[in-house]
Each structure stands twice: as C-alpha cells, then as structure tokens.
C-alpha cells in the first residue's frame, strides 16, 4: 500500500515515519493484507456500531442527534446491537477485499501496464471498490434491520433476507449505483492521500508513535471522506429502506429528499457532524489496526 510502513522489515529501532511511506507493493496472492483488513473491520464495527445506529436514524428521517438517541433509548438496550451481524459480515468482507485487492491489483497493473503510478493505483482502488459492491445485499439488510418501521416484520438477518427473496435478486441490490460511486470515490482518495497525509505528521521514532500517526492519519482522511460522501449515503439509505415497488433513480430520489428538506444544504447534511466524528474514530481504528497487524503477520 502506498504508505504502509509495515510492508518492509524493520530494524529494532525506528528512526522516522517518513522513511516508511515510499510505495512498496507486495507479491500477488499474499493473504496478510486480506486478513489484516478483516480484523481491522471487526474491531471497528464492535466499537462504533451504536454511533452508526444514531447516524442511520438521522440520515433516514432528518432528525436531530438528541431525537435519534431518544429513539434508541425507547427501543431498549436489547435492540442496541440489533442488526450488527450484516455490517459485521459486510465490513469484514469488504475491507478485506478493499485492502487485499488493492495490493494485488496494484501489483498486477504495475507489472503489465505502462502508465504513471498514480494512474495504476487509482484504477486498482476503483476496481477494489467495485468488487466490494458484490456484498451490497448485506448493507441492504443492515439498513432494513436498523429501520424501526420494519421491527415488526422481521427480527433477525435470516428473516430480512427471506423477506427480500420473493421480490427477486434485484431487490437485494437496491441502492447499488450510489454504493458503486461512493466506493470508487472514497477508495481512490483514501489510498491516494494516505501517504501524503502521514508525511506531514510529526516524525515517529517508536512503534507506539507510528500507531498514533496511523490513527490520526486514517481518522482525518476518513472524516473528510465521510463528510464528502454524506449526501450519497443519505440517498442510498432512502433507496434501501424500501421493500418492493419501483426502482427509482439516484437523481429522482435526491431531488425528492432535497425538496423534503426545504432545499437547504444544512438540512441535507443533518447528521453529518456525528458522521464526521464516527468516521474519525472508525477510520482511525481501521488504519491503526491494519498497520499494527501487518507488523506481526
């Protein structure tokens, strides 16, 4: 990966974080990047899931943070982690693909395509994001389980999948277009900016300092991308909250939401501040965990 200091064997004493940022792509087929991505995702979901539920309510209904928290309190602690299985399955799988495929595809493209490095890395990031979208059904079911309007229709992941089955396979992939756009955009920016951001952080001379830098760099980048992609996720959430019926286009749903929220940008970004903090924590955890595990695998 572009800035991964863990891709090279280190001497016992670390001298600088900036010396570890040079591009270094490993051989195709190494599973450590997939495994580290999977473990990083598990760690993140377990910690941040309650925050994600509050954010989901705000995206879906355009309500304030306090009202979303009150909704969750009324639902009770028993339902706080309701629906965690789909995001756990989805995130562990997609982040494994995100990191692993990016490494493999970058290696293949560099070997077989004569193009600038930034171009091959960009293409690898987009292709990895496209592959992640295969698991859209898990994100789809997660959306349904988090929506309290569907609490009386199904109580677990299996029932939610079963409820969609009668509508055909296309129903599992409702909201695919915004997911593809979000994945491609965020992957290109994440892998492209991770190295430069770390270069501008204070020089790290110990493993713990590297861990802090990885958390800060990943967190800042994740927060920025979370804010940038927030309107896309608002539309995606609205699309995936529907069961059956017409498959509406992205522009049509966006226009409908825009009108519902009084054509005000601030209303469209309602919940974005919480998303910013969640993304800051989530991607800090993901990036730091990923880089930490690479040192030991």
UniProtKB/Swiss-Prot annotation:
GO terms for molecular function: NAD transmembrane transporter activity. It catalyses: NAD(+)(in) = NAD(+)(out). It is a multi-pass membrane protein. Solcar repeats lie at residues 28-108, 116-200, 209-296. One of its GO terms (cellular component) is mitochondrial inner membrane. It is found in: Mitochondrion inner membrane. Pfam families: Mito_carr. One of its GO terms (biological process) is mitochondrial NAD transmembrane transport. Gene3D superfamilies: Mitochondrial carrier domain. The keyword Membrane applies. Its main location: mitochondrion. Coiled coil: none annotated. Belongs to the mitochondrial carrier (TC 2.A.29) family. This is Mitochondrial nicotinamide adenine dinucleotide transporter SLC25A52.
């Amino acid at each position: 990966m572009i800035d991964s200091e863990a891709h090279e064997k280190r001497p016992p004493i670390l001298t600088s974080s900036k010396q570890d940022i040079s591009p270094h792509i490993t051989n195709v087929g190494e599973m450590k990047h997939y495994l580290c991505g999977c473990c990083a995702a598990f760690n993140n979901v377990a910690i941040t899931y309650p925050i994600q539920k509050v954010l989901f309510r705000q995206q879906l209904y355009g309500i304030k943070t306090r009202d979303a928290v009150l909704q969750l309190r009324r639902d009770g602690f028993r339902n706080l982690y309701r629906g965690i299985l789909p995001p756990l399955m989805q995130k562990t799988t997609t982040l494994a693909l995100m990191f692993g495929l990016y490494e493999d595809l970058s290696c293949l493209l560099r070997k077989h395509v004569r193009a600038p490095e930034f171009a091959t890395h960009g293409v690898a990031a987009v292709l990895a994001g496209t592959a992640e979208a295969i698991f859209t059904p898990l994100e789809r079911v997660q959306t349904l389980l988090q929506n309290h309007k569907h609490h009386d229709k199904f109580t677990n992941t299996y029932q939610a999948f079963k409820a969609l089955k009668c509508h055909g396979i296309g129903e599992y992939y409702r909201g695919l277009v915004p997911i593809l756009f979000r994945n491609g955009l965020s992957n290109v920016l994440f892998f492209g900016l991770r190295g430069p951001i770390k270069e501008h952080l204070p020089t790290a001379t110990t493993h713990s300092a590297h861990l802090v830098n990885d958390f800060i760099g990943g967190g800042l980048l994740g927060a920025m991308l979370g804010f940038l992609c927030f309107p896309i996720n608002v539309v995606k959430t609205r699309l995936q909250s529907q069961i059956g019926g017409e498959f509406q286009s992205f522009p049509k749903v966006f226009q409908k939401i825009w009108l519902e929220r009084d054509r005000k940008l601030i209303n469209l970004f309602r919940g974005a501040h919480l998303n910013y903090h969640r993304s800051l924590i989530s991607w800090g955890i993901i990036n730091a965990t990923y880089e930490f595990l690479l040192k030991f695998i």
